[in-house]
UniProtKB/Swiss-Prot annotation:
Transmembrane regions: none
Protein name per its UniProtKB record: Protein Smg homolog
Source organism of this protein record: Vibrio atlanticus (strain LGP32)
HAMAP family per record: Smg
NCBIfam families named among the record's database cross-references: PRK03430.1
Family statement drawn from the similarity comment of this UniProt entry: Belongs to the Smg family.
Alphabetized PANTHER family for the sequence: PROTEIN SMG (PTHR38692:SF1)
Length: 158
């Protein structure tokens, strides 16, 4: 599954501070040895390329800043992928200033870029972490999100 590959790559190379300059062929071979399917590997690598492309100013035309008082209206396609719990979590992260509206849109873009029929809150948390890691200047938000990901809900957050 594509999400499993993304989590594997994130934990192995990014989160562990391993060598980030890995040859793509070596990476594909490693993922094949780890038991992932070739087709899923290509999809995951393409997904990561699209994530990196969101940083390109030419590609940000669809992802623009909007007012903090504006309300995000989801399309029917987005609603079918991002359930109410996930949408509520995105709103919560905006309210506590972990996500900006721009980063929220990047997250939604990457969620919609997944080829999966099953998507739940834990998957969303990983996607948010990956997006925050990819956007420079969000170290504090990344740390907050990391704490939310690695700490199981232990009551109400203050």
């Amino acid at each position: 599954m594509m999400m499993d590959i993304l989590m594997y790559l994130f934990e192995t190379y990014i989160h562990s501070d391993s060598e980030l300059q890995v040859d793509q062929d070596e990476l594909e071979d490693e993922l094949l040895r780890a038991g992932f399917h070739q087709d899923d590997i290509y999809k995951a690598l393409h997904w990561l390329e699209d994530l990196a492309a969101l940083q390109d100013t030419e590609n940000q035309a669809a992802i623009t800043m909007c007012s903090n008082t504006s309300m995000r209206i989801y399309t029917s396609r987005e609603i079918s992928r991002i359930n109410m719990e996930c949408r509520g979590f995105l709103l919560f992260l905006e309210q506590i200033n972990v996500l900006t509206t721009e980063i929220r849109e990047m997250v939604i873009d990457r969620v919609m870029g997944l080829e999966t029929s099953e998507f739940e809150l834990d998957d969303l948390k990983w996607i948010i972490l990956m997006v925050l890691f990819n956007v420079p200047g969000n170290e504090s938000a990344y740390t907050q999100m990391e704490e939310l990901l690695y700490t199981k809900e232990q009551g109400i957050l203050h």
